[in-house]
């Protein structure tokens, strides 16, 4: 045994899976699903009856939670689909750099500096204008499958 104290930075997720399996027939509208390797929010589900050859099928129409692109997939209802672990975390906005990155304050007092401003023009304008006016802003960051993006903004009053 050594008397040294080891400090570990918790950057990784300990090898935890980015997705979990769920039977296609149990995935509902407003749920999440992985289509073509992208985490998506389901906007429409339709099920076809069992045919002469095989299973009932689920037709998913979903929107990529990061790019907003519409994706579709057809899966037998008895088969498993990958469902992404989707997390939303709120951070206080501290600073916006010239190169488009934001500096965020985490709950434990550390800063998170590896996120870009969102690509959504409306949200981008709200963040820049609110920050320029000196408001205290809290941004919601959505993370799934190793990607993170600012998805919402809350104004918690003047500084």
From Swiss-Prot:
GO terms for biological process: positive regulation of translational elongation; positive regulation of translational termination. Residues 1-12 have a biased composition (Basic and acidic residues). CDD domains: S1_eIF5A (cd04468). SMART domains: eIF-5a. Residues 1-23 are annotated as: Disordered. Lys-52 undergoes hypusination, a unique post-translational modification that consists in the addition of a butylamino group from spermidine to lysine side chain, leading to the formation of the unusual amino acid hypusine. eIF-5As are the only known proteins to undergo this modification, which is essential for their function. The modification Hypusine is found at residue 52. Belongs to the eIF-5A family. There are at least two genes for eIF-5A in tobacco: 5A1 may regulate the light-dependent translation of specific transcripts while 5A2 may be a housekeeping protein. Translation factor that promotes translation elongation and termination, particularly upon ribosome stalling at specific amino acid sequence contexts. Binds between the exit (E) and peptidyl (P) site of the ribosome and promotes rescue of stalled ribosome: specifically required for efficient translation of polyproline-containing peptides as well as other motifs that stall the ribosome. Acts as a ribosome quality control (RQC) cofactor by joining the RQC complex to facilitate peptidyl transfer during CAT tailing step. This is Eukaryotic translation initiation factor 5A-2. The gene is EIF-5A2.
């Amino acid at each position: 045994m050594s008397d040294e104290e080891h400090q570990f930075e918790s950057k990784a997720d300990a090898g935890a899976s980015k997705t979990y399996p769920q039977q296609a027939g149990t995935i509902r509208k407003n749920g999440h699903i992985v289509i073509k390797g992208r985490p998506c929010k389901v906007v429409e589900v339709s099920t076809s009856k069992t045919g002469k050859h095989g299973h009932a099928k689920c037709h998913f129409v979903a929107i990529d939670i990061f790019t907003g692109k519409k994706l579709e997939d057809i899966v037998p209802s008895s088969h498993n689909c990958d469902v992404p672990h989707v997390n939303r975390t709120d951070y206080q906005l501290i600073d916006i750099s010239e190169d488009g990155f934001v500096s965020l304050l985490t709950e434990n007092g550390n800063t998170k500096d590896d996120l870009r401003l969102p690509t959504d023009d409306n949200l981008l304008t709200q963040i820049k204008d609110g920050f320029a006016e000196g408001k205290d802003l809290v941004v919601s960051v959505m993370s799934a499958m190793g990607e993170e993006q600012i998805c919402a903004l809350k104004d918690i009053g003047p500084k």
